[in-house]
Design a protein with these regions (language model features):
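Acidic/His-rich, divalent-metal-binding segments that scaffold phosphate/diphosphate chemistry
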Residues: 1-107
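Histidine/acidic-rich helix-loop-helix segments that form or flank divalent-metal centers
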Residues: 87, 100, 104-107, 129-185
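Catalytic-loop motifs flanking and including active-site residues across diverse enzymes
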Residues: 61, 87, 114-118, 156-159
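Alpha-helix termini
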Residues: 74-78, 127-132
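An amphipathic alpha-helix signature
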Residues: 66, 85, 115-119, 123, ...
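Divalent-cation-assisted or electrostatically stabilized phosphate/pyrophosphate-binding catalytic cores
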Residues: 10-17, 104-123, 183-200
Length: 201
């Protein structure tokens, strides 16, 4: 990690420590067994010119989604296993974005159906999870798949996860819009939209 980024790794390790369920332990050990993928995950941007489109952006976005999804699930009194599944989904929901670098050696963000590539990278732990607990596998797979509003099966915990993803994206977009603006600016244009904020006092 670059200078000043050690707190990101600390946050990452803290989140892994919250995953207690035996059936989810493979998602912790995944990183130790896939060093090339882990290095790509730490450094890549989360998008091309949208949210978190900078070095370490994918890691930052994944941490934010995992933290928001887990804390909201706990606050809304979901079961311990559902809270942990939401956390795992937050950490891994965009892992498909590293595929071009880790598997093909292509540097720079590549657009595409990254949700589908999630399953290519996570085939091993997902297979083991399917054997150990099919319902848990089905829930996590639903979160890792492309969003489908009218899917026949719906999970309340998935809505919490999807909202966490949306909130992380929107907050970063707002930060980037104001990044080169004076601290006192309360609004600015982004495309055809007016973006507003309350500046720090």
């Amino acid at each position: 990690l670059g200078k000043g980024r050690l707190p990101l790794l600390t946050r990452f390790i803290r989140l892994l420590g919250l995953i207690k369920a035996p059936i989810l332990q493979l998602f912790i050990s995944y990183w130790g067994m896939h060093i090339k993928q882990f290095e790509a995950f730490l450094t890549m941007p989360a998008s091309y010119q949208d949210h978190h489109a900078y070095t370490h952006g994918l890691l930052i976005h994944s941490l934010e989604v995992a933290e928001l999804a887990y804390s909201n699930a706990v606050r809304l009194q979901h079961s311990s296993i559902e809270c942990q599944v939401a956390l795992v989904a937050g950490l891994f929901h965009d892992i498909g974005k590293i595929y071009s670098l880790s598997e093909a050696g292509i540097y720079g963000y590549q657009t595409g159906a990254h949700e589908c590539l999630n399953f290519a990278l996570l085939a091993e732990p997902l297979q083991q999870l399917a054997i150990a607990d099919w319902d848990c596998h089905r829930m996590l797979s639903s979160m890792l798949a492309p969003y489908a509003r009218y899917r026949s099966e719906q999970y309340a915990i998935e809505a919490i996860f999807r909202n966490a993803d949306h909130n992380s994206c929107q907050s970063d977009r707002a930060r980037q819009v104001f990044a080169d603006k004076p601290a006192h600016y309360r609004f600015t244009k982004a495309g055809n939209q007016m973006v507003r904020r309350l500046p720090s006092s």
